[in-house]
Amino acid sequence: NSVFLRDNYTCRYCGNKLLSQKFIKSFIEKINSPLFTKGRTNLETTGLILLSWPVADHVIPWNLGGKTDLSNLVTSCAPCNYGKDGFTLEQLGLDNPFNKVVINTFWDGLDSKIKELKS
C-alpha cells in the first residue's frame, strides 16, 4: 500500500489513475452484480477492474533478482504489469519509471470515498 500512496495510485508506466483495492472490493460488495466481479483469474474478472486495479510492479523483475522493497517497486495498472511480465525495461525499450516525476495530485484511489460507499 505504501507504493500506491507514494505514487498517488497512478501507473508509473502509462499514467492511468487507479482505484484502491479496498475501494474496488467495497464497490463490488455494494453493487452485488455478477457483471462486476473480481475472480481468481483474468478470465473471471471484469475488464474495468483489470484496468483500475493497482499492482506493485518490480522494476527489476523478481525472477531476475529484483528486490521487493520501495526502491524497486512502482505502481502499475494490471495491463502494464502483465505486459511487462518478467522482462527488463531495456528488453522492452521502456524508460525507467523512477525517472518520471510523481506529481502530487492528491488522488487517493477513492480511498476517501469508502465510508460513503458503505453507507
Go through the PLM ranges and name each one.
Residues 1-7, 65-70:
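Short, flexible, mixed-charge glycine/proline-rich loop motifs
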Residues 1-2, 8, 15-21, 114-118:
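A boundary/linker detector
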Residues 9-10, 55, 76:
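The −1 position to Zn-ligating cysteines in a subset of zinc-ribbon hairpins
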Residues 13-14, 79:
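Short, cysteine/histidine-rich loop/knuckle motifs that typically chelate Zn2+
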Residues 19, 73-95:
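Short Cys/His-centered divalent metal-binding micro-motifs
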Residues 90-98, 102-119:
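Intrinsically disordered, low-complexity, charge-dense segments enriched in Lys/Arg
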